[in-house]
Amino acid sequence: MKIKSVRCVQIDAPETESSPDTRPGWNTYATRSQPIARYTDFTRVDGGKPGSTKKAWVHVTAEDGTFGLGSFAHGQLAASVVDYFIAPLIEGRDALATELLNDLVWRSQEGFQGGIATAAQSGVDLALWDLKGKLLGKPVYELIGGPSRQAVELYATGDDLEWMKELGFTRFKISNPFFYEEGSEGLTKLVEHVARAREIVGDEAELTLNPVMSFNVDIALRVAERLRPYKLRWFEEPLPPWDLQGYIELNRCITWTALATGEHHYGRKAFQQLVAARAADIIQPDIEWTGGLSETLKIYTYAEAAGIETITHMGGSTAWGQHFALAMPESSQAEWFMNTDVGQPLGDKLLPGVATAKGGKVVPSDAPGFGLEIPEDWIVPWDHSNQARAVYLPSQNQ
């Protein structure tokens, strides 16, 4: 079966109306530091990164009309890569040859792999896997080895901890309000933040902190030592992804909690270096950023052979991450990102066919492909003529 067309699209899903019984979730109030936050005219509070653009989708159609869908980040920047660079490379080729197609796209990007190009590759690869599952009549998790567990254990990311506990979660990741240039006052604020979280979730719950690349080695070591009494399950992405030597030093020095990183590492080669250097105890590829499912499977193999666990970034909230975690033995849990209001059903912002968390677990759809059930009239072509400029929100801390 040949690929007939590859197109970038967007999903025009109807928006869910807010209920008077809900209140705004952590994305609207939690102070979170990011690398750009060292400059006070950039926000530290909104859920999106300053300058980020909306997600886009890839629609791959086979000769018989069957289609697959996959999504990717940095949509407005990467959409042209899909339509004008990748599409003509793979149209007319075997739709089931996911390994060949992944390798073709990867080799075609020599010289500009990573970042925007790899995000575009992610969407194409996911759409191809979705199409492959549909053509073969199998869920994707069956195509990558079959289920290794009955359900995927989840940890919830957010600061609405009481609500998250009420929903049945027992594993939690909280935000980081501290950027290293704030000095000892900011560090004290962070310690108080973690102490409150530990008090709410209890001593037996898993608790994790995500600094989002906001530290240097010195501050990361000081933070890890100050937070030692609160028994973090892991310390996530304290440094920028390019600081391999910094991660090596941190992992050598921090022995009381696991070190995790990887969501901003792109493609197998970046992870090969990370794993070979044993620079982390847990790696966290994002399937929509790092090259898709094909790349993530290669990354998993590197890590598994080295005794390093793979827990995908945002994996529990996406169909692709759910299928991956169900199938891979050394992927003990997945991340459920809390993007709904407090009191709002978790499924309200999910697309049809994406499984919803229940009691801290999720069971992926067993429908062919990734199980997406998106109405065709929601799928509209990407409008390249309507490119919007990135939005940089003013700081709410000024």
Ranges and model annotations:
Residues 46-50, 346:
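Short Gly/Pro-enriched turn/cap motifs at secondary-structure boundaries
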Residues 80, 225, 231, 242-261, ...:
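Shared catalytic-loop signature of beta/alpha-barrel
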